């Protein structure tokens, strides 16, 4: 219903996933504690109240893919932000023998590629944007599946100038996720004019990351020209 109403307003609907994590307080973890990355025989390390799923195991990949795909099949969802906000620790797998534990990291990355390949083939209309704690997954491998990647969680317009300049030395501007964020900036507290924030974001994919109903009218009046 929500997606239909959004579409009726002439807008497309997007969703933000973080599918590579598992909460200890979840039915999935209680049923399959060995699906979390951990050194066999030792307790895993929680971070952000999460463990990382062991994507070196095909059964884990299939399970997570189906969970994501079932949501996308349920409605006209045309954008996905695929996020990964946790470092990998306790690099070990209950699905690999002792002499092949070193394969985990490589197999993990191949599994992410596999899931995103399946996703873009089943949903060819989908705009996929990768993200990992900001721009940690900004690399050619991810760009094969997603035409844009979130450049950095630092959305301060002044700092973004240097971030985007450096990224543009290697990657096209069209790949760099860049938004007009709120003011004062959530991370630095810096106040930057709305026009300046718009100009900086226009050097990337451009979007708004704020509540437009709560910004000053003079700023709101600039939006039609920025998006034209």
PLM segments and residue spans:
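Aromatic-lined carbohydrate-binding surfaces of glycoside hydrolases
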Residues: 1-5, 9-48, 65, 69-73, ...
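Alpha-helical packing segments of well-folded alpha/beta enzyme cores
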Residues: 2, 60, 64-71, 112-115, ...
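Glycan-recognition surfaces
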Residues: 23-62, 106-213
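Residues at the N-termini of beta-strands
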Residues: 78-79, 127
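Conserved beta-strand positions
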Residues: 82-84, 130
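Short acidic, glycine/proline-enriched helix-loop-strand junctions
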Residues: 94-102, 126
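Glycan-recognition and catalytic regions of carbohydrate-active enzymes
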Residues: 209-228
